[in-house]
Amino acid sequence: RIPSSAASDVYKRQPSDMMDGRIGLIRKNLDKHRYQDVQILSYAVKYASSFYGPFRNAVGTKGILKGDKKTYQMDFKNKNEALREVSIDIKEGADMVMVKPGMPYLDIISLIKKQFQIPIIAYQVSGEYSLIMNGIKRNIINEKAIIESLISFKRAGANAIVTYFADRILKYL
């Protein structure tokens, strides 16, 4: 079933759970209900990462949620799985892909860019943000590290970036 918001101002869908076949099912249902213009952002490359820790602490889910996301998120040591999952999701109808977290996987962004003709969204997660902010607060690095980190995504091949620094980078634009 397609939510009514798909017919209004929402033109993208992004299932973040990475379950196999999810993109194909969403595309099939969107097309069936004449929402061919709704784009799908695939979270095909979502690593089981320690960099999610600060977010889980901030929202209070660290000790509450049961189960282990490592059962469906990717092993950070594996690059071939990322390329395989991107290929599958493109065949199922994905219009763009997310790489999450971003900074530790700049090589993966670059490989996807070289192998596929699809927009890539890099997600700079809470742990990446925390590392940079702690460095700035302790005067270990300066605030220009924010821009440097974002430029690295673009240089690797990302078409867009999701970051907790959005409000801070406005002064650099």
Task: State the predicted function of each range.
Residues 26, 89, 153:
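Conserved, mostly hydrophobic/aromatic
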Residues 62-83, 132-147:
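Active-site mouth loops of central-metabolism enzymes
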Residues 9, 30-36, 61, 93-95, ...:
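Glycine-enriched alpha-helix->loop->beta-strand junction motifs that scaffold or abut catalytic
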Residues 1-7, 11:
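Single conserved hydrophobic/aromatic residue that forms the stacking wall/gate
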